[in-house]
Design a protein with these regions (language model features):
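Feature captures C-terminal
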Residues: 2-175
Length: 175
């Protein structure tokens, strides 16, 4: 809502992040989002958005027992889960047995398929928007706006405005 973006992307910022309870402290905010990133709005084509979602799916693997987890290079020797993004409100599915570039089997926004040539706006942190995290589709020239406040300040202000409703509907599937 703040940026007017169609889609938002966020990362698992810390392997110690547990989310929030009913009562939230500043410590909880900092544990869940320890970086002083700012929120950006980025202009992308649907094809670029698909590549970004595809890249994120590439962090995952399915073992012989069918269990899905992170590829070792993202968790050993040091976890780097802050490079793995999840997206909302798009609905997406990825077949992890397929080769890179073919894993995304569904990518829709409000029930309609993402169109390759259509322009979409993505809300994402400035680290990612400038190309951080090995995502080749991001670059500074795609940034349309950057908010002055960092995430911690925005979370703190948002959480002090009363009860927060969280959409817990799962909008992704990896298989």
């Amino acid at each position: 809502v703040v940026t007017g973006a169609d889609v938002s992307a966020t990362a698992v910022m810390s392997e110690n992040a547990k989310g929030f309870d009913k009562t939230v402290t500043m410590r909880d905010v900092l544990l869940n989002y320890p970086y002083a990133n700012q929120l950006c709005k980025v202009k992308l084509t649907g094809k670029q958005l698909r590549h970004i979602v595809e890249h994120s799916a590439g962090f995952l693997k399915k073992d012989r027992d069918g269990k899905i987890g992170f590829i070792d290079r993202w968790i050993k020797p040091k976890p780097m889960l802050y490079h793995f993004d999840v997206f909302y409100p798009v609905e997406y599915e990825a077949d992890l047995s397929k080769p890179e570039g073919e894993r995304i089997t569904k990518l829709t926004l409000h029930g309609k398929p993402i169109e390759d040539d259509k322009i979409y706006h993505l809300a994402v942190n400035n680290y990612r928007a400038m190309g951080g995290g090995f995502y080749p589709e991001y670059s500074m020239d795609k940034i349309e706006m950057t908010l002055d406040k960092d995430y911690v300040q925005m979370f703190s202000e948002y959480l002090t405005h009363g009860d927060v409703e969280v959409d817990t509907k799962k909008n992704y599937k990896f298989y």
